[in-house]
Each structure stands twice: as structure tokens, then as C-alpha cells.
Amino acid sequence: MILRHFGFILIILTVYLSSTHATTRKHHRRSIDNDARNLGFQFVMEPRRNVTVMESSSHLLECSYVLAHERLVHDVRIEWKRDGVLLSERTSSRIKVMSNGSLWIESVSSAEEGTYQCAVHVTTKSDQTSDTWTFLSRKATLRLADLAKFELQAIDRTLAKGQPTAFHCLINSKPTPTAVWLHNDEPIVNGGEYHILPVSNTLEISSTQSRHEGTYRCTVEGAGKRRSSQTARLTVTTETVSNELVFITTPRLQVVEQGDEFLLECLVASLIRPQVRWLKDSRQIIVDGVRIRRVGVSSILVSRASIEDTGLYTCRASNNDDSIDRAVSVEVRAPPRITTRPTTKVAVETADVELECGTAAARPEARVNWYKNGEAIIGSEYFVIEPNRLRILGVVRADQAIYQCIAENDVGSEQASAQLLVDAPDSSSVAASSGVPMTSSAPLGLRSTSSGSRFINVEWDPPVQRNGNIMRYHIFYKDNLIDRERMINSSSTSATLTSLQPSTMYLIRVTAENEAGMGKFSDSLKVTTNKEQAVPGKVASLTTTATGPETIDIRWSPPSGGQPALRYKIFYSHDPLEKNEKETLITTSTTHYTLHGMDKYTGYQIRIEAEGSNGSGLSSDTVKVRTQSDEPSAPPVNIQAEADSSTSVRVSWDEPEEESVNGEITGYRLKYKTKARGAKGNTLVIDATAREYTMGNLEPNTQYLIRMAVVNHNGTGPFSDWVSIDTPGQDKEERTLGAPREIRPHAGIDYILVSWLPPADEQNLVRGYQIGWGLSVPDTETIRVTASTTQYKIARLHSERDYVISLRAFNNLGSGFPIYETVRTLSRETPSHFNEDSDSDDSDVGSSESTPVGVRAEAISATSIRVMWTESDETAFNTQYTVRYSTAVDGNQHRYVNSTETWATVEGLRPATEYEFAVRAVASNGQLSTWSMATRNRTLAAPPSSAPRDLTVLPAESGDPHSSSLHWQPPKYSNGEIEEYLVFYTDRASLADKDWTINYVAGDKLSHQVSNLLPKANYFFKIQARNEKGHGPFSSVVGYTPSGGAILSGKDRHNARGHGSAASGDTVSLVDQLQSLLHSNPLYLILLAAFALILILTLILIIMCCWKRSSGGGRKNGYQSGKKTSAGAGSGGGIGGLGGPPNDLWINGTGSHMRAGASDYMVDGLATAHLTAADIESPTPRYHHLQGQGTLTRSYHQSSQSLEGRQRTPQVVYTGTGRHQPIQRIDFESPYGSSSAIGSASTPPLPMQAPPSGPPTVIDGYRTLRGTPPNSSAANALRSFTQLAGATPPPPHSAASSSSRPTIIAAGGRQVPVGRATAQPRVNVANIYSPFASCSASSDAGESDKKSGECMEMRETTPIKSNTAGSSNGEKMNTNMNPSHSAEDLNAHLENLDTMLDDLQQLQHNLHFETSMDK
């Protein structure tokens, strides 16, 4: 038992010692840092890359180094090469190698020009071997300085006074020569009016004057030489210069080296000095004044150029009218720079070694060459040269050397080196205590399982004696005719040898490795690869050149080896490769081909295969190329304009699709103008990085048209359609915003579509909206949108969750009040709300049929939408589909379309209408699937199919007779958003539509004012609507004749509108028509004068008859006329104050239908009061008249001077009580707004009698009211009078009633007391509606000696005063006046007068008709 334990411990100790010894062996291996063979070579000084020296001068090319380990160094030798040829001091006495390795050249001549390189040879010796290591420096180019010829010289110039100009003096030489300018052979001093630009030596004059005329030339000195330019003459004229932009100098194409400076010239002439900006690759250059500074008038100088300065530079000059661009490319060339250097390595024979050499970006692109001990390496089967990498396969002892990568281009070169040390395979092994080796035995049974022309598969069995764990197997193989052996590793007992040569015998052997190292080798296996069919090799010298925006030229050379090529296959695709894109194949038999129809400014990758009789050979390397740029082919998209204030508009847009830009965007061109005909447009050029721009200094209350185009280096693309925007008349205020008026959410499974209406206060400025949402709480997430946005889709939500949505508007004062809405997203089992309907066919829905997925709708036209979907069941057969669609316009009424394909076209839709679609599958057995998720889309717009409605023409609100106001309603079928209305008008209806005058009105306006109309001329109006697709039909023509009267005041216009004086839009007043008719027909003037004379005589006759009857003493039971007093103090009671009894005919001698002067307010026993139009504003009638009270209806048009167009005065209503009444008061504070609603507050209405329905509304030429005596019936009233409808009945006669003061109710805010009223009032409407109404009152005959009447007169602000003279005069008249014998006589006269007025009205209609016919 003890022995067994002892044996176990011994075994463990043996294994531990073995592993310790193996570890010790590994640790004793030499480190590269401590290896004496590692020289640690490094160049301290290398020759400069490019050197320019003066002829016959001396120059030193430096070359010095250091060695980290010199113990084994035996000798160091330095050599110089010129253009790859070794230099010797023996062949040239002017060349000498210094002790530190530098090269000294004396008296440099053209023979010494070339490329120089230093080579350092280091020889080391050890006990066994001697090795030579060679290091190469970078290359240096030596050139002689020279003064080249002029590239640009001064030319004659003639220009206007005050314009800038420039003269060139360009020589491209190094070093840069010095220049001197001469004006009339006198030197010019730089500064002030003259600017001599650096680098190019251009002379600029910022503002030419007469003193600048003369000759100009420059003299240049450099490289020991001197040159003079040609002489140019400057002529200054006094001609007027246009505002057109013209380039004087433009930037030129330049290639500069890193670290140098370059000048970009740009000088532009115009009437007004333009603004000049510089852009680099569409971004504006910031002139910092240090590295980039402005020189001259508008040129820029860039110092210390770097690769980042390479690009396209654009000089952009602009003024208010236009802008011009001139672009030029600048290439900054830089020498290569090695970023990843190869490292010194120690390798074991048969191993593979990789050396990396990575370079940074260089212009032009650097070439990397590999050198072994100063000799160029040519790629082979064992030296594989890859980009930035060198692979050495199967390292042998001869591969030990210095490996260098040298990157070089036309500017310079850079080198990096590494030392490769090669050791023999490690043969040491670990022996056990018995002396038996611990490595494994040889693997057994090595065999080949398969082989081809380029590969061999081998297998073997593990060794019998493993002596530990087998860590890996090493497979060695080599060409039977070559000593270089290669090795690969495998962790299993099989391997595949690749990259072999066809028809070649290979020797293969295997060994196993355990903890002690590699074991014994197996016996070698000989395997011969198969013969390969002869195919062409790779094509050589593949080059691609973009010859245009859509063409690429491809050229190559035939393959150098293999079978001859019969044809070539060209493969090309986009770079980078688009999704699911495949290469395009073109076959050709020539070694060049031109691709046509390529995308503009698009990258492509191209490769070529040569094809022989046995198939295609290896593909060439892929070459990338980009087609040339071109002018943009599309304008910006999503252009929106929004008024920021009354003088500024903010425009926003998105860049077009990338494939339509055709280059790099350098800016956006924005044109804007007013909508007025012949308006001059303005042009702005905006930076390419901008997505919005604010235009300022605009006119308030003006409509502007805006359109945009994309600008690139090739020019300006097409402009967009005009976008209209109206600036407000006044700036909106920024106050705290109210909540949006409405929020309408629409929920889906994982989204919520939110739409809203803006706040109600349109005068409050809204700068945007903030939308917030969250699960059960608002504002967990928020986003802000612009003020013009009224819809937003909230995506990436969870299904079947309650979300609280908040919406608030904001401006500079902050966020306004929010509005909230709670919405629940849909369930995934309920794809859309279509499943919630109650259609009968939904009852048959089964679950066995799969639901269509991926439903999408694509608008085809204005009346059709194509619906497409994907069948989710790939095994479905003979399936039919039902498409259901609806729109909110029809109340979401469902309609259906059937299809047997996975698409359907729905026809007969409304233009510009959003529809919702869902699809379900119908199996052959009749089973139905559930409805798919709903999708929405909108049909395309179409021109309006109906005209604007209800076109109405009214007088202008301002009262201007030269203007009219048009009102209309939108078309019933607009077929899209109305962009504008076209108002056509003319004074000749027979003209063609193109000859009518057109006014353009924004689509959101429904009214427009037309100005500059001629009074009394017939105008015809019609209107047309336009949307984005075109114009709609015309509305019906509406005629209108502007009046020629004076401009009415605000109150008069209100009265005129209220009584139809101009409301019809196609009529004029009677007076205007008569005036027009009389001017054109003198005969009518004679007839009218005769008629007026007859009318006057008739009136005189009637007055005389009435006077005789009243003075002759009539019957006692006759009609008792009321007494009245003249309106004016001291005037008589007759017509015109002549003293006779006043007439009661309501017609004066001026031809008006109602008296315009001071008239009677005929109430017995009352004094007279005057009311002016300025005192009382005419109220809108609130009560209606009753035709049943004997109202005589008159229907004819009124002039602007008629009584109906004048200011109303309060009406007096009497209570019907005793003759003695308290003084009435006019209540201007009454809410009734009418002077006809009269009565005491204490007077109750009659039982079962409706309240007053309104005053007698005057819609005719005149209307008269007269009270009815208490003892007479209403039916016995005169035809020319009417009893006040619904009059308040008389209250009981008592002290209370006698002490109450009746009130006249009117608007105006004052209570005016008037005279007393009798129980039988007689009211004359001529007085009520006269601007100077009078009221008179006289006491009864029995009371004439006790109390006299008072006459009150109202003026603008003067209180009513009693008219004593008028009162006494009235009493005298009352004493002398006899009562009328009969009321029937007066009625007869009045009936005759009514007949005459009817005849006058008929005459007026006849005259109007004849006038219309003449026109």
C-alpha cells in the first residue's frame, strides 16, 4: 500500500519537473530586444524630399544614422544613388560623400538634376556566419531654379467709372519671383486704391476713376532672370452700368503642395457692389484673418495648405436681383506618411511571416514597394505582396534580411524597415529519468483522401506514443523541385492544403507536438495535383474614366498568361452595393468599352474576367469610379412658408432625393416676388447646410410668391412651383397661448396619429407645438414641431396600453395651456377598427384562413388607388381577396372590391380624399380570414370640377364709389386644397377671358376688394378656383354698377345697407340713374321739367282748396285737424315759412319723396323739437309692421339722399289716455335700440294681446303713421296711414298715471324730454326719419289761456330748449284756424296723390329700362 502511494507521488513529481523544464526551455529562448543580431538601425537625417537650388551653387544632401547594437557590427558602408544608378566619386569630381554619410554637390548644373537616395550597408560577423544588412533612405528630388513664362498677362480693359478692375501677372515658378507694377511707366505702391495680390501678383483697382486711365505692365525678377509683361491700357467711361453681375477675375484651377499657400481670386462688377462669399464643398468659409484671410477686394489667401484644404471652392456673388457662382477645384498634394511600420521579428524555418506597412492618405495616392536588403521584391508564390502587407510563406534561412517598405508619390517618399531573423527548428527535447525522450512518436497512416488542381486533402492517425497531450499537428509540404518548405497547423487528424499549383508533385509530412515539443516526422507522402483546364489569366492595366455624367470609359490589356481570351466579361454594380443588388454583366470582345446610361454622380465598382474556350479565368481587381456631376434634376421638396411677422416670412424645405442632386449641393436659390402683375422678383442664394431661411424687409398685408431650386457646382436645377404666403397686416402679439381648439387622435397597434386645430385667438403668435405622451401620465416623452404642422405620428408604442397625450402651443413667452386626450392602442389580435363593425359578412370569419399582411396603398391617379398585399400562407391555392375601403367624407360607408391577385385597383374615388383600406382572404371553401391591418392613402389631386359658389358683389366697406367688395364660397368639389382664386372682371362682357382683368386671391380668403372702378359703369364679375393641378370652371357672371355719389359716413353706410340702397350689387339709386339719363337724353329733361311744373301746380291747387275749406268754416262734425307750429323760431306755419296753414302731404317741392327740411311732428297740443343726425345713431329695427292696418306699400329704389338712407330719430308712441299727458322722455339707454318701442313702464299690455312685433320697417319709398281717434275703429283708418301695431292700451286715469313721464326709447345714451302728447296722436314718418325732426304741441282751445306749448329743439350736444316764439305763434294759429269739414275730403286728395306717385314710380321704371337698353 505504501509502495503504491509512493509510486503515485513519484509520477506527479515527474510530470511537474517535466513541465518546469519545458517552461525553463521556453524562457531561455532569445528575446528580439536582447538578441545581439538585432541592429536597431535608425536614420537620424535623411535628404529633403524636394530641393530647388540656383545654378552653379553648392548643396548638401544629408544622410546620418544610429545603431542600437554594434557588438556584432564589422563594417558600415554608405552609397548614393541617382535615379537608381550608383554614384561614384571617381566619375564626378563635384560629388563627395562626407564622413557622416552626407553627399556634397559642388557647382550644381543641369546634369545633377534627378532623384537621390542614400543606401547604408552594415556587415555583421558572428562565430559561424557573416551577414550584410542594407538600409535605404527616402528619395529626394533635386531641381534647378528657373523663371518660367507668363501664364496670364494684363489685357486692355474698358469699363465705367466706379467699377473695379484687375490686371494679371502670373508666372508659376519656384521660388516665387518678385513683381513690380508700372502705371504709365511709374512704379505703383501697394496699398490705398491699388492692391497687389500675393502669389499671383495680380493688380486690383477697387474703384476706377479718371486718374487711373493709362497703361499698365508688370516686371518679374527671379532665378537671376527678368521678364516684362505686355502693356495693357485702361479706359474709363461715363456710361451707365446695369445691375447685372459680371466676373472680372475668377478663381483658377490649382495644384499646390502641402505647407504652401494658395490664392483664390474673385472680382465681380455690378451697379451696386455685390456681396461675395466663398464656399468650400457647399460650406461657407470662415475667414479668420490668420490662416485664411481676405486680400484685395474679395479674394482670399490660404496659408499652410493641408490635405483637408483639397476640395471645390465656389465664389458666390449676389445682389438683390440675382446671384452668380464660379467654382474651381484645388488639390493639395502631400507626400505619403507611414502609419503602421513593420516590426523586427525572429522566425523559425518553415513558418509564415507577415510584415505590415500601413500608410495614411496621400495625394496623389501612394505606391508601396517592398525591398529586401535594398533589392526590390517581385511578387511570387512564396512572396505574396498584398495591400499594406508582405507575406513570406515557408521561411528559409536565406530569407533573413532587412525588409523595407517605401511609399512614394509625385510629391515625395517615406520608408520604414524591419529586420527578419531566422532560426533553425528547435530540436531539443526533454528526457525522462530513464533517458527515454518525452516527445511523441511519428503519426501513422498519412494518406491523401482527395485532390484537385489547386488543393489536397490529407488524413493521418495519432502517434502510438503520445507522451502527454497532443497540442497540435504540423503539416509540412513543398514542391518536389523546390527546397522551400511550407507548414500549416491543425488541431485534428486532417488538413487541407490550398493555393497549390496544378500538375505539380508535392511532398507532405506530419509531426505531432506535445508539451515537450514537436515529435518525430511521419514518412513523406507524394501527391500530384490534377491537371487544370487552361483558362486565361487576369487582365492587366484595368483603368476606368468617367467621361460624363452618364458615361464611363473602361480600358484594359489582355492577360499575359494562360489560354488566349476569346471575350471579356465586365461586371459592375453600385458602390456601395445597394440592398439586394446584383452585378450587371456585359460581354465584349474588345479591350475597351464605354458604359452608357449610368446614374449621375454615382459611384460604381467594376471588375473584368477574361473568358477562353475552357471558361473564365481569374477576375481582375475591383476598380472604383464615380460618374461626373451634372445640374440638379429636381427642386427642393416639402417647401413651406410661414409668416413670422408682418415684414418677415420663414421658409423651410428638405433637400431632394440624393439621385436627383447629381453632385454636391452648394446652395439653394430662392426667388420671391409679390403677387402683383409685373412685380419684380428678388433672388437669394442660401447655404447648402441650411434647411430654413427668414426673409425680412417685406411689405405688410402683401401676398408673396416663393419658389426654390438646388444649386451645385454645375449650375442651378429646375425651380419648384410657386408657393404663396400672405404677410399679415399687423404683427401678431406674443401672449400666453390658449389651448388648441381640438385634438383628434387615431390609434393603431403601435402608433397614435394625432391631429389638431390651432388656438382660437388668431392674433396671438404661435411659433410651434409641443406634443407629449406617456403611459397613463403625460409628457414622459415630448417633441416639438413647427407652427404649420397640424398632424404628427407617435410611433414605437406598446399595444393595448393607455397613453395620455398632451398638446400645447408655444411662443417666445413659453408654452401655452395644454389639451389632454387619453387613447388606447389597439390589440394585435384586433388589427384595426374595421373588425368592430357589424357587417353581415363578418359573421362568417373563420380562423383557418390566413390574414393578408403588408397591406399598402399607392395612389395612381385622382380617382384610383392600387392596393397591394402579401399572402401570409405560402401554400394557399386559389384564394380570392376582398378589399374594403371607406372615407370619412361618406360617413365611413364601406365599399368592396374583389380580386384574385395580391393587388387590386380601386376606381371611382374622389380626388384629394383620404381612404382607408383593409383586405381579407376568401378560401375556395368559403372560409374568410380576419381583416388585415388598415392602411390609408389619399388620391391625387385634380383640377376643381365646380366653380366657386354664391358670388356676391357689394359696395366697398370704406364707402369708396370706385371700389367694390366681392364675397363667395369655396367650390363644392375643389378636388384638392385651393391655392388661389382668380377674380375676373371687365366692363365689356363680350371680351375673351384672356382680356379680362385678373386679381389673384389666396386660397384661404373668401372675399376680395376690387379698386379703381369707374362710377356709373357696368362691370361684370366671375371667379375661378385653382389648386395644384389646375384651374376649375368659371362661376356665373355677376353684374354690378358702382354708384357715383359721395362717400358715406359709417352710420350712413349702415343705413344704406340696411335698406338695400346698394345691397343688390347691380342697381344704382334713382337719383343717379336720373342724372345719367338726363345727361344723355335732353328730351327727358324737358319732359321731367314739364312734369315737375304740373306737379307743383297740382300741389298749389290742393293747398288752396284745403286752405279755403279750413278758413270757410266746415261742418261741426267734420274732421278736427291738429294744430302745428313751424320748426324754426319765429317762422310761419306754412310751406317754407310763408305763413299759410301747413300742408299735410309729406311731399316737398324738391322732388324728394319725403321732406328733407324741418318738418312737422303733428301732434295736437305739442311743441316742436329738432333732432340732428349726429345726435342719434340709427338703430336696427327690432319690430315688424302689420299689413293689416291699411298700410300702403310702395316699391321703388331710393337714392342716397332719400329719407330711408338718413339717420333715424326717435319715434313717439302715445298711451291713448286723456289729452293732458306728462312730458315724454327719450331713453337713449334702452336696450330696444328703436325709437318705436314707446310707452310708460307702468302701462300694462292689453289682455291676450301679443307684445309689439316691431316698428314699421321702411323698405319702400316712404311710410306714414297716423294715430286713430279714440272713437273710430281701426278699419276706418286712412289708406296712407297705419295704426301702430300692438300699441299699449291706455291705463286708468289717475294721479299716478298723470304724474308718470312717458319715455321715447332710442339709442344714443341720453334721455331727452319732449313736449306733451294728446290722446289721438298723428305721427308723420317724414318727421320721424328726418335728420331735423320737429315736435309741436298746442293746448286745447279751452286751456289756451292757461298753458302754452313748448317747442324743444335738439342739436348735436345742445339740450332741448323751449321755443317761446313758436309756441305763441302756434296759439295764434290755433285761434284763427277753423276745423276741417270732413276727413273724407282729405282722404280723397290723398288718394289722388297716391295715384300720382304710382305714376311717377312707373315712369322711373320706364326710364331705367330705356337707360339699360341704350347701354
Curated annotation (Swiss-Prot):
Signal sequence, start to end: 1-22
Provide one Gene Ontology cellular component: axonal growth cone
Q: Does the keyword Transmembrane helix apply?
A: yes
Per the UniProt topology annotation, the Extracellular ranges are 23-1082
Transmembrane regions: 1083-1103
Membrane topology designation: Single-pass type I membrane protein
Per UniProt, the keywords (alphabetical) are: Cell membrane, Disulfide bond, Immunoglobulin domain, Membrane, Neurogenesis, Repeat, Signal, Transmembrane, Transmembrane helix
Pfam families in alphabetical order: fn3 (PF00041), I-set (PF07679)
Subcellular localization: Cell membrane
Primary place of residence? membrane
Query: Keyword Repeat, does the record have it?
Result: yes
Q: Where is this region: Disordered?
A: 612-658, 830-853, 940-970, 1112-1136, 1178-1274
The disulfides recorded in the entry are C63-C118, C169-C218, C266-C315, C357-C405
Residue intervals annotated with topology Cytoplasmic: 1104-1415
Instruction: Name the residue ranges with Pro residues bias.
Output: 1244-1255
Which PANTHER family would you find in this protein's record? FRAZZLED, TITIN
Question: Domains: what does the record tell us?
Answer: Fibronectin type-III 6 motif is essential for the role of unc-40 in a TGF-beta-like signaling pathway.
**What is annotated about its quaternary structure and interactions?**
Interacts with netrin unc-6. Interacts with eva-1. Interacts (via fibronectin type-III domain) with drag-1.
Biological role:
Receptor for netrin unc-6 required for asymmetric axon formation, axon guidance and cell migrations. Required during axon formation, in response to unc-6, to initiate, maintain and orient asymmetric neuronal growth, and may signal via phosphoinositide 3-kinase (PI3K). Mediates axon attraction of neuronal growth cones in the developing nervous system upon ligand binding. Axon migration is mediated by the secreted unc-6, which promotes attraction of neurons and axons through binding to the unc-40 receptor, while repulsion requires both unc-5 and unc-40 receptors.
Q: Could you identify this protein by its name?
A: Netrin receptor unc-40
User: What organism is recorded for this protein?
Assistant: Caenorhabditis elegans
